[in-house]
Amino acid sequence: DKIELEVTKHWEDNSNINGKRPISIKYLVSGNNKTKEEIVTGNTTTDENWNYKFTDLPKYDSQGNEIVYTIDEQEVTPGDLKFYNKSITGLNIVNTFHVPDERISVNVSKHWEDNNNINGKRPESIKYVLTGEGNVTEQVVTGNTTSDTDWNYTFANLPKYNSQGNEIIYTIEEQETNQNDLKFYVKQANGNYKNGFNMVNTFKVPLETVDISVNKHWVDDNNANG
């Protein structure tokens, strides 16, 4: 005797609003130490075309016992279901959108272009400001005033994805710890959050001008001699 088993699927992802649903999936039906596989391509915004019927499955094993079949699904391409949790009840598979709680670290390094602070204008500390998805993390770092030692910092345990499953893009900025700490420096940020940021501070005297008032007084009896 032969039987048929139809696998049904439901996506809990608000019609794929975040664009993370794969275009295809692999179904597996296993029984009596044998497995059949089938790749199914379905609609990326509805549940349409995601069901599949396995046919011509033996009902009994060689001892006449009814075979118990189980189903499962696998990714066609690695990462296809990264943003989904799956739940299997009988022959129904439910995939629920879920953002994994992955964490990353962002490294910040610094280089001073000031001839080892020969002019004595380098500050003792600096504030690094890391921004991602509107969230701001600040860190004050105190470093060596004649070298690049101790100016690096690592922002750790940062969320990798936002609530839509998109990778968060982090940007870096530095600020003065005290007013005018960087008055004699031009700052430049290089790199990115994936490979690390490098902050370069180059010594430069600002082009500031001052006004000088000159007062004159004539001691000549009001120019009596012409």
Say what each PLM segment does:
Residues 1-226:
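Solvent-exposed loop/turn and edge beta-strand elements of beta-rich ligand-binding domains
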